[in-house]
Regions:
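C-terminal non-catalytic regions of proteins with extracellular/luminal or membrane-system context
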Residues: 1-148
Length: 148
């Protein structure tokens, strides 16, 4: 509907990667909420991160993160040509966004930390206090309008 899907990254003009927020699986949850909400690490394991960065460094890349909590992704952010954060929207909406079918607007309802250390050092009961966040609470961009 929008583009031709390439068989390999080498054949692609642009790579679109979609990820969920990293988390640590709980094998035997003791509490009801552990069955529903992700917890644990906010960064990807090194092997997974290397795999992602290898693709990102191959071609221009649009990285899409479906988030249910903040993620520590500075290397992915730096390597990506574009970074899109969504909160459980449909893939068709993301395709329409990428192909310019509408002018997106939105603001982050969370702060995106710049490192695991920044997460560890921040206070649990104080909002928006991490050191040098990758993206601050309320950050948002939109496409520039074409007046032609």
């Amino acid at each position: 509907k929008y583009a031709t899907i390439a068989a390999t990254p080498e054949e692609a003009d642009v790579i679109v990667l979609k990820f969920g927020t990293p988390f640590t699986p709980v094998e035997d949850p003791k509490f009801f909420l552990e069955r529903i909400f992700h917890q644990g690490r906010l960064d990807f394991p090194e092997a997974k991160k290397r795999e992602m960065l290898k693709l990102i460094n191959t071609k221009p890349t649009i990285s899409i993160f479906t988030m249910n909590r903040p993620a520590v992704i500075p290397e992915i952010n730096t390597g990506s040509s574009a970074l899109i954060v969504d909160f459980e929207c449909q893939d068709e909406i993301l395709a329409e966004l990428i192909f310019g079918k509408f002018n997106p607007t939105g603001k982050l309802p969370i702060e995106m930390p710049s490192s695991v250390k920044a997460v560890e050092d921040q206070l649990e009961d104080v909002p928006h206090d991490s050191k040098d966040p990758l993206y601050q609470f309320g950050f948002g961009l939109e496409y520039q309008k074409n007046n032609n």
